[in-house]
Amino acid sequence: MNKILNIIMALFIAICFFGCEKDDICSGGTPTTPRLMIEFREKDNPSILKPVTNLTAVATGMTTGVVFNEGLSSTDPNRYLTSANKIGLPLKITGETTEYTLTQNSTSTNPAIRNEDKIVFNYTTKEIYVSRACGYKTNFDLTGSPVQEPNTVDSNRWISNIVVETPNIVTENEIHIKIYF
C-alpha cells in the first residue's frame, strides 16, 4: 500500500511539474508601437537643428497635451512642455488620421508671440504580433505629406515646411518627419 501511495504521489508531482509553463513577461526592451518622430530645423539653413520654445502638442479630442516630462506631477503644466529639437508623437491605432495642434511659445500671454499650427497626419496601420506576453504592436505607413490646417486665429504660421523623411514608422530610432520653421 505504501508503494502505491508513493507511485501516485510521484506521478502527481511529475504531472504538476511538467504541466507548468515559464512565466510570460514582456521585457522592457521589447519594441512596442512606435511614436512619430519629428525633428525641427532652421528654415533658412536646413542643416541646423532648431529647438522649439515651450512647445505643446495636443491631439484633437485630448484634454491635455502629450507628456514630454514624465518626472513631473500630472498637475504641473511644465509636464506638457518641451523646448527640444526632436519630439515623439503617438498616433491613434484605431483610425487612419491623427490631428495635432502644435503651439510654439505656449506659455506666453502675448498673442503676438504665442503661435499654433494644426497638422493632420494620414496613415495606414498594420498590427504585428510580438509575443504572447507583449501582444501586438502597430506600425504605421504615412500616406502623403502631413496637411497643415488653415490657422483660424491669425494668418501667421510658424511652420514653414513639413518634409516626410521616412514614411514607414516601425521604430523610434529614426526621424520620420522634419519640420522647418
What are these language model-derived features?
Residues M1-P31:
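Bacterial Sec-dependent N-terminal signal peptides
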Residues E39-L49:
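Structural motif
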Residues E21-T30, E39, P77-F181:
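Extracytoplasmic cysteine-anchoring/structural motifs
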Residues P46-I48, V67, A112, S131:
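Short acidic, gly/pro-rich beta-turn/loop elements at beta-sheet edges
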Residues D44, G61-T63, S106-S108:
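Solvent-exposed strand-loop boundary residues in beta-sheet-rich modules
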Residues P34-L36:
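Structural beta-strand segments of beta-rich domains
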Residues G65-Y80:
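Solvent-exposed serine/threonine-rich low-complexity stretches and specific carbohydrate-binding patches
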Residues L49-V66:
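Extended low-complexity, serine/threonine- and proline-enriched intrinsically disordered segments
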